[in-house]
Amino acid sequence: MLEAAGLEVHSGDVTDASSLRGAGSGMEVAYFLVHSMGGGVGFAEREQLGARNFAQMARREGVERVVYLGGLGDETTSKHLRSRHETALALAAEGPPLTYFRAAMVVGAGSESYRTLRYLVGRLPVMITPAWLRTATQPIGIDATVEYLRRAPDVPESEGREVQIGGPDVLTYGEMLDRMALAMGKRPRPKLPVPLITPWLSALWLGLVTPVDTRVARPLVEGLRTATVVTDPSGAEPFEISPASFDEMLRRALAEEAEQ
């Protein structure tokens, strides 16, 4: 498909530096949108290796800017969030100037976060509510996220800095589940508080009732225990983008799924 559109495809593995030779030839901007959570144990180490190899390739081959999408939140509270942040540090240390976007949940048809919400609402008549369902987050739609990434090379203020992005709504995960139910034409699900459930049990629960692999679910659940909201909007201001509301994100995602 990409070749048919006149694009050149370079296949490689970011953990194998030799496979990246020539990947950045002729490029001005390179996007690093790689994560290794699905690989289970050791995903953080693989991410750092991949980031270093990619950054070194970009610098060696004359790439002028690297753009990376990481996560919002206090990176000291979760191995998942810490790995996202350390990946940015590796890219900045080893490569060209970095634009480091940080986002919470990205909502769009096909995204893991969206699918998890939809499956929880669609499959469970009653929902157990671990403490993390009361954590605040600031979701952003896939359309706005892609637009931030696309505009980055044309926004000089974003070079060499962190850019926190989010939609207009700050919600708890429980509130997002209720809004998903309403968007699907269902009543919000009754909730059964289970305050002492561990991240491991939460991940197992998600793995049983949603398509999310338990190996992916556990680091995600660990990250859900900390608030993921924009604390410094200044980096996003030069982009002049107005992300959609959470309800509009859901409407678009459900409509796109219905068309598939």
Residues covered by each model-derived region:
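A short helix->loop->beta-strand "cap" motif at the edges of active sites that frequently abuts
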Residues: 60-65, 95-96
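Mid/C-terminal beta-alpha module of Rossmann-like enzyme folds, strongest
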Residues: 148-219, 227-260
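NAD(P)H-binding glycine-rich loop region in Rossmannoid oxidoreductase-like domains
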Residues: 1-61, 71-75
